[in-house]
Amino acid sequence: VPSNTLDQLLVQLDELKRDFDRNSRARILKILAQLERRRFADADSLSRFHETLLFIRAYPPSAQILRRVEKILSSFSTRVETLSEAGADLSPLENVEISGVSGTFVEDTFSYSITRWLVLRHPSQVSIDWEAHEDEYRLAATWPRFLPLLEEDALVEANVPYLDWLHAAKGRGLRDLGWLIERFERLPLAEKEKAELYESLKLYVRWELGDSRATRTLMKRPVRKIFYHTKPLLRRSDVSLAREFAEPSIPLQRLSRSQGEAVLNLARETSTMRYRELYGFTHGDARRVFRADIGRGVEVFLMGVPPDRRLPLRAYHAGLIFKNGVPACYVEGLSLFERMEIGFNIYYTFREGESAWIYARVLKIFRQLLGVTTFSIDPYQLGYENEEGIESGAFWFYRKLGFRPTLARVVKMMKAEERKLAARPTSRTPARILRQLSEGHMLLEIPPAFRSRWDKFQIRNVGLAVQRRMASRFDGDAVKIRRASVESVTRALGVRTKDWSENEGRALEDLALVLALIPDLARWTKDEKRDIVRIVCAKAGTAESRYLRLLQRHSRLRDAIIKLGS
Protein backbone atom coordinates (compact mmCIF):
# COMPACT_ATOMS: atom_id res chain seq x y z
CA VAL A 1 0.00 0.00 0.00
CA PRO A 2 1.72 3.21 -1.13
CA SER A 3 0.30 5.42 1.61
CA ASN A 4 -0.92 4.65 5.09
CA THR A 5 -2.62 7.85 6.22
CA LEU A 6 -6.07 7.10 7.62
CA ASP A 7 -7.97 9.00 4.94
CA GLN A 8 -6.03 7.40 2.10
CA LEU A 9 -6.52 3.93 3.54
CA LEU A 10 -10.27 4.53 3.74
CA VAL A 11 -10.37 5.83 0.16
CA GLN A 12 -8.40 2.82 -1.09
CA LEU A 13 -10.63 0.37 0.76
CA ASP A 14 -13.75 2.02 -0.66
CA GLU A 15 -12.32 1.85 -4.19
CA LEU A 16 -11.36 -1.81 -3.79
CA LYS A 17 -14.67 -3.02 -2.34
CA ARG A 18 -16.06 -3.70 -5.85
CA ASP A 19 -12.89 -5.31 -7.22
CA PHE A 20 -12.76 -9.08 -6.89
CA ASP A 21 -9.52 -10.24 -8.51
CA ARG A 22 -6.80 -12.00 -6.49
CA ASN A 23 -4.56 -8.92 -6.30
CA SER A 24 -7.41 -6.78 -4.97
CA ARG A 25 -8.26 -9.38 -2.34
CA ALA A 26 -4.69 -9.30 -1.06
CA ARG A 27 -4.71 -5.50 -0.92
CA ILE A 28 -8.04 -5.47 0.93
CA LEU A 29 -6.66 -7.82 3.59
CA LYS A 30 -3.58 -5.66 4.01
CA ILE A 31 -5.61 -2.46 4.35
CA LEU A 32 -8.04 -4.09 6.78
CA ALA A 33 -5.12 -5.18 8.96
CA GLN A 34 -3.79 -1.62 9.03
CA LEU A 35 -7.17 -0.03 9.74
CA GLU A 36 -7.99 -2.56 12.46
CA ARG A 37 -4.97 -1.31 14.42
CA ARG A 38 -5.83 2.35 13.92
CA ARG A 39 -7.32 4.55 16.59
CA PHE A 40 -10.04 6.70 15.01
CA ALA A 41 -10.17 10.27 16.26
CA ASP A 42 -13.44 11.39 14.65
CA ALA A 43 -16.87 9.95 13.95
CA ASP A 44 -16.81 10.80 10.24
CA SER A 45 -13.84 8.54 9.56
CA LEU A 46 -15.27 5.78 11.74
CA SER A 47 -18.62 5.90 9.92
CA ARG A 48 -16.88 5.73 6.52
CA PHE A 49 -15.02 2.64 7.70
CA HIS A 50 -18.22 1.13 9.08
CA GLU A 51 -20.19 1.54 5.84
CA THR A 52 -17.42 0.08 3.68
CA LEU A 53 -17.15 -2.90 6.02
CA LEU A 54 -20.89 -3.51 5.75
CA PHE A 55 -20.71 -3.45 1.96
CA ILE A 56 -17.88 -5.99 1.97
CA ARG A 57 -19.85 -8.11 4.43
CA ALA A 58 -22.75 -8.24 1.97
CA TYR A 59 -20.51 -8.64 -1.11
CA PRO A 60 -17.49 -10.57 0.25
CA PRO A 61 -14.70 -11.63 -2.14
CA SER A 62 -13.44 -14.43 0.13
CA ALA A 63 -14.07 -16.25 3.41
CA GLN A 64 -10.85 -14.85 4.86
CA ILE A 65 -11.90 -11.27 4.17
CA LEU A 66 -15.40 -11.91 5.54
CA ARG A 67 -13.98 -13.27 8.81
CA ARG A 68 -11.72 -10.24 9.18
CA VAL A 69 -14.58 -7.83 8.45
CA GLU A 70 -16.86 -9.45 11.03
CA LYS A 71 -14.09 -9.39 13.62
CA ILE A 72 -13.59 -5.65 13.08
CA LEU A 73 -17.34 -4.96 13.15
CA SER A 74 -17.58 -6.68 16.54
CA SER A 75 -15.24 -4.00 17.95
CA PHE A 76 -17.37 -1.00 16.97
CA SER A 77 -19.18 -0.55 20.26
CA THR A 78 -15.78 -0.18 21.95
CA ARG A 79 -14.57 2.17 19.21
CA VAL A 80 -17.62 4.41 19.65
CA GLU A 81 -17.16 4.40 23.43
CA THR A 82 -13.51 5.42 22.99
CA LEU A 83 -14.56 8.35 20.80
CA SER A 84 -17.19 9.40 23.33
CA GLU A 85 -14.72 9.30 26.23
CA ALA A 86 -12.35 11.47 24.19
CA GLY A 87 -15.07 14.10 23.81
CA ALA A 88 -15.44 13.64 20.05
CA ASP A 89 -18.53 14.86 18.24
CA LEU A 90 -20.67 11.76 17.64
CA SER A 91 -23.44 13.52 15.72
CA PRO A 92 -22.27 12.15 12.32
CA LEU A 93 -23.28 8.70 13.60
CA GLU A 94 -26.83 9.98 14.13
CA ASN A 95 -27.33 10.76 10.42
CA VAL A 96 -30.47 8.97 9.20
CA GLU A 97 -28.52 7.19 6.45
CA ILE A 98 -25.96 5.66 8.82
CA SER A 99 -27.75 5.49 12.18
CA GLY A 100 -27.89 2.15 13.98
CA VAL A 101 -24.16 1.69 14.66
CA SER A 102 -23.20 -0.39 17.71
CA GLY A 103 -22.65 1.77 20.78
CA THR A 104 -25.02 4.53 19.64
CA PHE A 105 -28.74 5.20 20.08
CA VAL A 106 -31.78 6.16 18.04
CA GLU A 107 -34.43 8.50 19.41
CA ASP A 108 -37.75 9.49 17.91
CA THR A 109 -41.49 9.81 18.51
CA PHE A 110 -42.15 6.28 17.34
CA SER A 111 -45.67 5.06 16.63
CA TYR A 112 -47.65 3.31 19.34
CA SER A 113 -47.27 -0.05 17.60
CA ILE A 114 -43.50 0.24 17.30
CA THR A 115 -43.08 1.61 20.83
CA ARG A 116 -45.12 -1.25 22.26
CA TRP A 117 -43.06 -3.72 20.21
CA LEU A 118 -39.80 -2.14 21.44
CA VAL A 119 -40.96 -2.47 25.05
CA LEU A 120 -41.67 -6.16 24.50
CA ARG A 121 -38.59 -6.88 22.39
CA HIS A 122 -35.93 -4.66 24.02
CA PRO A 123 -37.38 -3.68 27.43
CA SER A 124 -34.11 -2.76 29.15
CA GLN A 125 -32.82 -0.69 26.22
CA VAL A 126 -35.72 1.72 25.65
CA SER A 127 -36.75 4.71 27.74
CA ILE A 128 -38.51 8.07 27.49
CA ASP A 129 -36.33 11.14 27.01
CA TRP A 130 -38.30 13.48 29.27
CA GLU A 131 -35.95 16.39 28.59
CA ALA A 132 -37.00 16.35 24.95
CA HIS A 133 -40.74 16.42 25.76
CA GLU A 134 -42.38 19.81 25.29
CA ASP A 135 -46.18 19.46 25.29
CA GLU A 136 -47.32 19.16 28.92
CA TYR A 137 -50.87 20.07 27.93
CA ARG A 138 -51.20 16.68 26.26
CA LEU A 139 -50.15 14.97 29.51
CA ALA A 140 -52.86 16.92 31.32
CA ALA A 141 -55.45 15.76 28.80
CA THR A 142 -54.40 12.11 28.73
CA TRP A 143 -52.86 10.95 31.99
CA PRO A 144 -55.94 11.41 34.23
CA ARG A 145 -57.25 8.23 32.58
CA PHE A 146 -54.82 6.23 34.69
CA LEU A 147 -53.59 8.68 37.38
CA PRO A 148 -56.54 9.30 39.76
CA LEU A 149 -56.99 12.91 40.97
CA LEU A 150 -54.37 14.30 38.55
CA GLU A 151 -57.04 16.74 37.32
CA GLU A 152 -56.90 18.44 40.73
CA ASP A 153 -53.37 19.54 39.85
CA ALA A 154 -53.25 19.58 36.05
CA LEU A 155 -56.41 21.59 35.32
CA VAL A 156 -55.67 24.59 37.54
CA GLU A 157 -52.01 24.65 38.61
CA ALA A 158 -48.90 25.86 36.80
CA ASN A 159 -45.67 23.83 36.70
CA VAL A 160 -47.34 20.51 37.46
CA PRO A 161 -44.73 17.86 38.47
CA TYR A 162 -46.05 15.19 36.11
CA LEU A 163 -43.11 12.86 36.69
CA ASP A 164 -43.73 12.95 40.45
CA TRP A 165 -47.28 11.78 39.79
CA LEU A 166 -46.05 9.09 37.41
CA HIS A 167 -43.35 7.77 39.73
CA ALA A 168 -45.69 7.73 42.72
CA ALA A 169 -48.20 5.67 40.74
CA LYS A 170 -45.87 3.13 39.18
CA GLY A 171 -43.81 2.31 42.25
CA ARG A 172 -40.21 1.13 42.31
CA GLY A 173 -38.53 -1.26 39.93
CA LEU A 174 -40.67 -0.41 36.92
CA ARG A 175 -39.57 1.66 33.93
CA ASP A 176 -41.63 4.70 32.93
CA LEU A 177 -42.19 3.60 29.35
CA GLY A 178 -43.17 0.02 30.12
CA TRP A 179 -45.62 1.15 32.81
CA LEU A 180 -47.24 3.71 30.50
CA ILE A 181 -47.59 1.27 27.61
CA GLU A 182 -49.25 -1.23 29.95
CA ARG A 183 -51.73 1.47 31.03
CA PHE A 184 -52.59 2.27 27.41
CA GLU A 185 -53.06 -1.42 26.68
CA ARG A 186 -55.63 -1.64 29.51
CA LEU A 187 -57.75 1.26 28.23
CA PRO A 188 -61.22 0.13 27.03
CA LEU A 189 -60.58 1.54 23.56
CA ALA A 190 -60.14 0.16 20.07
CA GLU A 191 -56.56 -0.39 18.92
CA LYS A 192 -56.58 2.61 16.58
CA GLU A 193 -57.94 4.88 19.32
CA LYS A 194 -55.20 3.79 21.73
CA ALA A 195 -52.62 4.56 19.06
CA GLU A 196 -54.07 8.01 18.36
CA LEU A 197 -54.14 8.83 22.08
CA TYR A 198 -50.56 7.66 22.72
CA GLU A 199 -49.15 9.35 19.62
CA SER A 200 -50.78 12.66 20.59
CA LEU A 201 -48.33 12.79 23.54
CA LYS A 202 -45.34 13.01 21.15
CA LEU A 203 -43.06 11.16 23.59
CA TYR A 204 -39.44 10.83 22.48
CA VAL A 205 -38.31 7.25 23.00
CA ARG A 206 -34.59 6.46 23.12
CA TRP A 207 -33.31 3.05 22.09
CA GLU A 208 -29.80 2.44 23.45
CA LEU A 209 -28.34 -0.02 20.97
CA GLY A 210 -25.20 -1.12 22.80
CA ASP A 211 -23.84 -4.37 21.35
CA SER A 212 -27.29 -5.64 20.40
CA ARG A 213 -27.59 -8.01 17.46
CA ALA A 214 -30.28 -5.62 16.26
CA THR A 215 -27.73 -2.96 15.28
CA ARG A 216 -26.83 -2.42 11.65
CA THR A 217 -23.29 -3.29 12.70
CA LEU A 218 -24.14 -6.78 13.92
CA MET A 219 -27.48 -7.66 12.34
CA LYS A 220 -27.12 -10.69 10.13
CA ARG A 221 -29.55 -13.45 9.35
CA PRO A 222 -28.02 -16.97 9.50
CA VAL A 223 -27.48 -18.35 5.99
CA ARG A 224 -26.58 -21.84 4.85
CA LYS A 225 -24.08 -20.76 2.22
CA ILE A 226 -22.29 -17.47 1.56
CA PHE A 227 -22.05 -16.30 -2.05
CA TYR A 228 -18.49 -15.08 -2.59
CA HIS A 229 -17.91 -12.60 -5.42
CA THR A 230 -14.95 -13.46 -7.63
CA LYS A 231 -16.17 -11.70 -10.80
CA PRO A 232 -17.43 -8.15 -11.50
CA LEU A 233 -20.83 -7.26 -10.05
CA LEU A 234 -23.85 -7.38 -12.33
CA ARG A 235 -24.52 -3.93 -13.76
CA ARG A 236 -27.78 -2.46 -14.98
CA SER A 237 -26.69 -3.09 -18.58
CA ASP A 238 -26.44 -6.81 -17.72
CA VAL A 239 -30.11 -6.92 -16.73
CA SER A 240 -33.02 -7.57 -19.09
CA LEU A 241 -36.52 -7.53 -17.61
CA ALA A 242 -37.84 -9.44 -20.62
CA ARG A 243 -35.28 -12.16 -20.01
CA GLU A 244 -36.07 -12.28 -16.29
CA PHE A 245 -39.81 -12.67 -16.90
CA ALA A 246 -39.13 -15.45 -19.41
CA GLU A 247 -37.11 -17.45 -16.87
CA PRO A 248 -38.71 -20.37 -14.97
CA SER A 249 -40.71 -19.54 -11.84
CA ILE A 250 -38.79 -18.81 -8.66
CA PRO A 251 -39.67 -21.33 -5.89
CA LEU A 252 -41.54 -19.71 -3.00
CA GLN A 253 -41.60 -21.15 0.52
CA ARG A 254 -44.30 -20.14 3.00
CA LEU A 255 -42.79 -19.83 6.47
CA SER A 256 -44.28 -21.09 9.71
CA ARG A 257 -45.84 -18.47 11.96
CA SER A 258 -42.82 -18.44 14.31
CA GLN A 259 -40.42 -18.12 11.37
CA GLY A 260 -42.56 -15.33 9.94
CA GLU A 261 -42.54 -13.49 13.27
CA ALA A 262 -38.74 -13.75 13.41
CA VAL A 263 -38.47 -12.16 9.95
CA LEU A 264 -40.91 -9.40 10.93
CA ASN A 265 -38.85 -8.66 14.05
CA LEU A 266 -35.74 -8.27 11.88
CA ALA A 267 -37.69 -6.03 9.50
CA ARG A 268 -38.92 -3.79 12.34
CA GLU A 269 -35.45 -3.57 13.84
CA THR A 270 -33.70 -2.72 10.60
CA SER A 271 -36.30 -0.03 9.82
CA THR A 272 -36.60 1.50 13.28
CA MET A 273 -32.86 1.99 13.70
CA ARG A 274 -32.90 3.87 10.37
CA TYR A 275 -35.72 6.17 11.55
CA ARG A 276 -38.11 4.55 9.09
CA GLU A 277 -41.37 2.75 9.60
CA LEU A 278 -42.96 0.63 6.90
CA TYR A 279 -46.62 -0.23 7.31
CA GLY A 280 -46.13 -3.83 6.24
CA PHE A 281 -43.30 -4.40 8.71
CA THR A 282 -45.13 -2.80 11.64
CA HIS A 283 -48.40 -4.64 10.97
CA GLY A 284 -47.20 -7.62 8.93
CA ASP A 285 -49.06 -10.94 9.06
CA ALA A 286 -46.63 -13.55 10.44
CA ARG A 287 -48.84 -16.29 8.97
CA ARG A 288 -48.33 -15.01 5.42
CA VAL A 289 -44.57 -14.57 5.03
CA PHE A 290 -42.93 -16.08 1.96
CA ARG A 291 -39.25 -16.69 1.29
CA ALA A 292 -37.55 -16.84 -2.10
CA ASP A 293 -33.90 -17.64 -2.75
CA ILE A 294 -33.21 -15.70 -5.96
CA GLY A 295 -29.54 -16.63 -6.24
CA ARG A 296 -26.20 -14.86 -5.69
CA GLY A 297 -26.73 -14.92 -1.91
CA VAL A 298 -29.99 -12.97 -2.03
CA GLU A 299 -33.10 -13.91 -0.04
CA VAL A 300 -36.41 -12.11 -0.51
CA PHE A 301 -39.07 -12.18 2.22
CA LEU A 302 -42.54 -10.97 1.26
CA MET A 303 -45.43 -10.42 3.64
CA GLY A 304 -49.01 -9.18 3.59
CA VAL A 305 -51.07 -7.67 6.40
CA PRO A 306 -53.96 -9.29 8.34
CA PRO A 307 -57.58 -8.48 7.38
CA ASP A 308 -58.09 -5.87 10.11
CA ARG A 309 -55.05 -3.89 8.90
CA ARG A 310 -55.72 -3.89 5.16
CA LEU A 311 -56.16 -0.87 2.94
CA PRO A 312 -59.74 -0.20 1.79
CA LEU A 313 -59.11 -0.85 -1.92
CA ARG A 314 -55.56 -1.85 -2.80
CA ALA A 315 -53.84 -5.07 -1.76
CA TYR A 316 -50.73 -4.41 0.33
CA HIS A 317 -47.45 -6.33 0.31
CA ALA A 318 -44.02 -5.50 1.68
CA GLY A 319 -40.66 -7.18 1.39
CA LEU A 320 -37.24 -7.23 3.02
CA ILE A 321 -34.25 -8.37 0.98
CA PHE A 322 -31.08 -9.85 2.49
CA LYS A 323 -27.73 -10.13 0.74
CA ASN A 324 -25.62 -12.88 2.33
CA GLY A 325 -27.73 -12.43 5.47
CA VAL A 326 -27.36 -8.63 5.58
CA PRO A 327 -30.51 -6.46 5.17
CA ALA A 328 -29.83 -4.59 1.92
CA CYS A 329 -33.14 -3.21 0.66
CA TYR A 330 -36.90 -3.22 1.08
CA VAL A 331 -39.91 -3.03 -1.21
CA GLU A 332 -43.56 -2.03 -0.93
CA GLY A 333 -46.29 -2.98 -3.40
CA LEU A 334 -49.82 -1.54 -3.59
CA SER A 335 -51.95 -3.45 -6.08
CA LEU A 336 -55.34 -3.08 -7.73
CA PHE A 337 -56.34 -5.50 -10.49
CA GLU A 338 -53.12 -6.10 -12.48
CA ARG A 339 -51.56 -2.72 -11.60
CA MET A 340 -48.98 -2.45 -8.80
CA GLU A 341 -47.52 0.77 -7.46
CA ILE A 342 -44.07 -0.34 -6.39
CA GLY A 343 -41.54 1.40 -4.18
CA PHE A 344 -38.08 -0.16 -4.10
CA ASN A 345 -35.45 1.22 -1.73
CA ILE A 346 -31.82 0.18 -1.51
CA TYR A 347 -30.26 1.06 1.83
CA TYR A 348 -27.64 3.77 1.35
CA THR A 349 -24.66 1.53 2.09
CA PHE A 350 -25.48 -0.96 -0.67
CA ARG A 351 -26.37 1.31 -3.60
CA GLU A 352 -23.20 0.34 -5.46
CA GLY A 353 -24.23 -3.31 -5.40
CA GLU A 354 -26.37 -5.36 -7.77
CA SER A 355 -29.47 -3.17 -7.41
CA ALA A 356 -30.90 -3.53 -10.92
CA TRP A 357 -30.64 -7.33 -10.92
CA ILE A 358 -32.27 -7.62 -7.48
CA TYR A 359 -35.04 -5.24 -8.58
CA ALA A 360 -35.73 -7.31 -11.70
CA ARG A 361 -35.98 -10.51 -9.65
CA VAL A 362 -38.35 -8.86 -7.16
CA LEU A 363 -40.65 -7.75 -10.00
CA LYS A 364 -40.67 -11.32 -11.27
CA ILE A 365 -41.70 -12.63 -7.84
CA PHE A 366 -44.56 -10.13 -7.58
CA ARG A 367 -45.70 -11.06 -11.09
CA GLN A 368 -45.59 -14.72 -10.12
CA LEU A 369 -47.27 -14.40 -6.70
CA LEU A 370 -49.93 -11.78 -7.45
CA GLY A 371 -50.52 -11.86 -11.20
CA VAL A 372 -49.64 -8.16 -11.64
CA THR A 373 -48.51 -7.11 -15.12
CA THR A 374 -48.36 -3.31 -14.89
CA PHE A 375 -45.84 -1.71 -12.55
CA SER A 376 -46.13 1.98 -11.65
CA ILE A 377 -43.41 4.20 -10.20
CA ASP A 378 -44.53 7.17 -8.10
CA PRO A 379 -43.01 10.58 -9.02
CA TYR A 380 -41.36 10.80 -5.59
CA GLN A 381 -39.34 7.66 -6.36
CA LEU A 382 -38.16 9.37 -9.54
CA GLY A 383 -37.04 12.54 -7.75
CA TYR A 384 -40.15 14.71 -7.49
CA GLU A 385 -39.57 16.78 -4.33
CA ASN A 386 -36.87 14.22 -3.52
CA GLU A 387 -33.31 15.44 -4.07
CA GLU A 388 -31.90 12.01 -3.34
CA GLY A 389 -33.75 10.68 -6.39
CA ILE A 390 -32.40 13.54 -8.51
CA GLU A 391 -28.81 12.97 -7.38
CA SER A 392 -29.01 9.24 -8.12
CA GLY A 393 -30.57 9.77 -11.56
CA ALA A 394 -33.50 7.53 -10.60
CA PHE A 395 -35.48 8.46 -13.72
CA TRP A 396 -32.83 6.96 -16.00
CA PHE A 397 -32.46 3.87 -13.79
CA TYR A 398 -36.09 3.00 -14.46
CA ARG A 399 -36.12 4.22 -18.05
CA LYS A 400 -33.19 1.98 -19.00
CA LEU A 401 -35.00 -0.99 -17.47
CA GLY A 402 -37.95 -0.36 -19.79
CA PHE A 403 -40.31 1.93 -17.86
CA ARG A 404 -41.99 4.77 -19.77
CA PRO A 405 -43.44 8.10 -18.59
CA THR A 406 -47.19 8.61 -18.90
CA LEU A 407 -47.39 12.41 -19.27
CA ALA A 408 -47.12 13.62 -22.87
CA ARG A 409 -44.93 16.61 -21.98
CA VAL A 410 -42.54 14.35 -20.05
CA VAL A 411 -42.37 11.94 -23.01
CA LYS A 412 -41.47 14.83 -25.32
CA MET A 413 -38.77 16.10 -22.95
CA MET A 414 -37.40 12.58 -22.41
CA LYS A 415 -37.04 11.94 -26.15
CA ALA A 416 -35.20 15.23 -26.61
CA GLU A 417 -32.87 14.39 -23.73
CA GLU A 418 -32.27 10.88 -25.08
CA ARG A 419 -31.19 12.39 -28.41
CA LYS A 420 -28.75 14.70 -26.60
CA LEU A 421 -27.28 11.83 -24.59
CA ALA A 422 -26.93 9.70 -27.72
CA ALA A 423 -24.94 12.49 -29.37
CA ARG A 424 -22.82 13.08 -26.25
CA PRO A 425 -22.62 9.76 -24.35
CA THR A 426 -20.41 11.15 -21.57
CA SER A 427 -22.76 14.03 -20.71
CA ARG A 428 -25.19 14.01 -17.77
CA THR A 429 -28.76 15.24 -17.56
CA PRO A 430 -28.91 18.51 -15.55
CA ALA A 431 -30.79 18.39 -12.25
CA ARG A 432 -33.25 20.97 -13.61
CA ILE A 433 -34.27 18.60 -16.41
CA LEU A 434 -34.42 15.59 -14.06
CA ARG A 435 -36.86 17.47 -11.83
CA GLN A 436 -39.18 18.02 -14.78
CA LEU A 437 -38.84 14.42 -15.94
CA SER A 438 -39.89 13.24 -12.47
CA GLU A 439 -43.23 15.06 -12.46
CA GLY A 440 -45.33 12.10 -13.60
CA HIS A 441 -45.63 8.36 -13.06
CA MET A 442 -43.68 5.80 -15.06
CA LEU A 443 -45.19 2.47 -16.11
CA LEU A 444 -43.85 -0.90 -17.15
CA GLU A 445 -46.30 -3.22 -18.92
CA ILE A 446 -45.59 -6.93 -19.22
CA PRO A 447 -47.57 -9.04 -21.70
CA PRO A 448 -50.49 -9.68 -21.58
CA ALA A 449 -50.97 -6.18 -20.12
CA PHE A 450 -52.75 -3.66 -22.37
CA ARG A 451 -50.55 -0.67 -23.14
CA SER A 452 -51.79 2.70 -21.86
CA ARG A 453 -54.83 1.24 -20.04
CA TRP A 454 -53.64 2.63 -16.69
CA ASP A 455 -51.85 5.77 -17.94
CA LYS A 456 -54.19 8.32 -16.36
CA PHE A 457 -55.33 6.31 -13.35
CA GLN A 458 -54.66 7.49 -9.79
CA ILE A 459 -56.25 5.81 -6.79
CA ARG A 460 -56.63 9.22 -5.14
CA ASN A 461 -59.13 10.24 -7.83
CA VAL A 462 -61.43 7.43 -6.71
CA GLY A 463 -61.27 8.68 -3.12
CA LEU A 464 -61.95 12.26 -4.19
CA ALA A 465 -65.00 11.13 -6.17
CA VAL A 466 -66.36 9.56 -2.97
CA GLN A 467 -65.77 12.84 -1.09
CA ARG A 468 -67.66 14.83 -3.73
CA ARG A 469 -70.60 12.44 -3.50
CA MET A 470 -70.55 12.70 0.29
CA ALA A 471 -70.57 16.51 0.10
CA SER A 472 -73.34 16.77 -2.48
CA ARG A 473 -75.71 14.05 -1.28
CA PHE A 474 -74.95 13.40 2.39
CA ASP A 475 -74.08 16.83 3.77
CA GLY A 476 -70.50 15.73 4.44
CA ASP A 477 -71.62 12.97 6.84
CA ALA A 478 -69.31 9.93 6.62
CA VAL A 479 -71.65 7.71 8.65
CA LYS A 480 -74.58 8.43 6.33
CA ILE A 481 -72.68 7.78 3.10
CA ARG A 482 -71.29 4.51 4.44
CA ARG A 483 -74.70 3.27 5.52
CA ALA A 484 -76.40 4.36 2.30
CA SER A 485 -73.65 2.88 0.11
CA VAL A 486 -73.88 -0.52 1.79
CA GLU A 487 -77.67 -0.51 1.46
CA SER A 488 -77.68 0.46 -2.22
CA VAL A 489 -74.86 -1.91 -3.19
CA THR A 490 -76.24 -4.97 -1.38
CA ARG A 491 -79.62 -4.26 -2.96
CA ALA A 492 -78.06 -3.93 -6.43
CA LEU A 493 -76.06 -7.14 -5.96
CA GLY A 494 -78.96 -9.02 -4.40
CA VAL A 495 -76.87 -10.21 -1.48
CA ARG A 496 -77.67 -10.72 2.22
CA THR A 497 -74.85 -10.15 4.69
CA LYS A 498 -76.45 -11.34 7.94
CA ASP A 499 -73.96 -14.20 8.34
CA TRP A 500 -70.87 -12.30 7.19
CA SER A 501 -67.85 -11.97 9.48
CA GLU A 502 -66.71 -8.67 10.97
CA ASN A 503 -63.82 -8.47 8.48
CA GLU A 504 -66.15 -9.16 5.54
CA GLY A 505 -68.49 -6.45 6.79
CA ARG A 506 -65.60 -3.99 7.00
CA ALA A 507 -64.48 -4.87 3.47
CA LEU A 508 -68.03 -4.37 2.19
CA GLU A 509 -68.28 -0.96 3.89
CA ASP A 510 -65.11 0.22 2.16
CA LEU A 511 -65.71 -1.26 -1.28
CA ALA A 512 -69.38 -0.21 -1.28
CA LEU A 513 -68.30 3.45 -1.24
CA VAL A 514 -66.73 2.88 -4.67
CA LEU A 515 -69.26 0.41 -6.07
CA ALA A 516 -72.02 2.93 -5.29
CA LEU A 517 -70.40 5.30 -7.80
CA ILE A 518 -71.12 2.86 -10.66
CA PRO A 519 -74.45 4.11 -12.07
CA ASP A 520 -75.58 0.92 -13.80
CA LEU A 521 -74.43 -1.62 -11.21
CA ALA A 522 -77.95 -2.98 -10.69
CA ARG A 523 -78.16 -3.85 -14.41
CA TRP A 524 -74.98 -5.96 -14.48
CA THR A 525 -75.37 -9.66 -15.19
CA LYS A 526 -75.99 -12.20 -12.47
CA ASP A 527 -72.48 -13.65 -12.94
CA GLU A 528 -70.85 -10.21 -12.77
CA LYS A 529 -72.68 -9.45 -9.52
CA ARG A 530 -71.81 -12.84 -8.03
CA ASP A 531 -68.15 -12.26 -8.84
CA ILE A 532 -68.21 -8.86 -7.10
CA VAL A 533 -69.52 -10.55 -3.94
CA ARG A 534 -66.66 -13.05 -4.16
CA ILE A 535 -64.20 -10.16 -4.55
CA VAL A 536 -65.55 -8.40 -1.44
CA CYS A 537 -65.26 -11.57 0.64
CA ALA A 538 -61.75 -12.25 -0.69
CA LYS A 539 -60.65 -8.78 0.47
CA ALA A 540 -61.28 -10.07 4.00
CA GLY A 541 -59.83 -13.51 3.34
CA THR A 542 -56.57 -15.07 4.49
CA ALA A 543 -54.52 -13.78 1.53
CA GLU A 544 -55.03 -10.71 -0.64
CA SER A 545 -53.49 -12.56 -3.57
CA ARG A 546 -56.88 -14.23 -4.11
CA TYR A 547 -58.59 -10.81 -4.01
CA LEU A 548 -56.27 -9.62 -6.78
CA ARG A 549 -56.74 -12.72 -8.92
CA LEU A 550 -60.52 -12.33 -8.75
CA LEU A 551 -60.27 -8.63 -9.62
CA GLN A 552 -58.09 -9.44 -12.61
CA ARG A 553 -60.84 -11.69 -14.03
CA HIS A 554 -63.58 -9.05 -13.76
CA SER A 555 -63.16 -6.94 -16.90
CA ARG A 556 -66.32 -4.87 -16.44
CA LEU A 557 -65.41 -3.87 -12.90
CA ARG A 558 -61.87 -3.00 -14.07
CA ASP A 559 -63.24 -0.68 -16.76
CA ALA A 560 -65.54 1.04 -14.25
CA ILE A 561 -62.79 1.58 -11.67
CA ILE A 562 -60.31 2.87 -14.26
CA LYS A 563 -62.95 5.35 -15.46
CA LEU A 564 -63.52 6.57 -11.88
CA GLY A 565 -59.78 6.95 -11.26
CA SER A 566 -58.85 8.60 -14.53
Predicted segments with their positions:
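Hydrophobic transmembrane signal anchors and adjacent membrane-proximal interface regions, especially
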Residues: 98, 128, 182, 203, ...
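Long, charge-dense tracts
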Residues: 116-267, 272
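A conserved beta-strand-loop-helix scaffold within acyl/acetyltransferase catalytic domains
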Residues: 248-351, 360, 364-370, 503, ...
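Glycine-centered secondary-structure boundary/capping sites
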Residues: 1, 315, 351-354, 494
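Charge-rich, low-complexity amphipathic helices
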Residues: 388-389, 419-421, 426-427
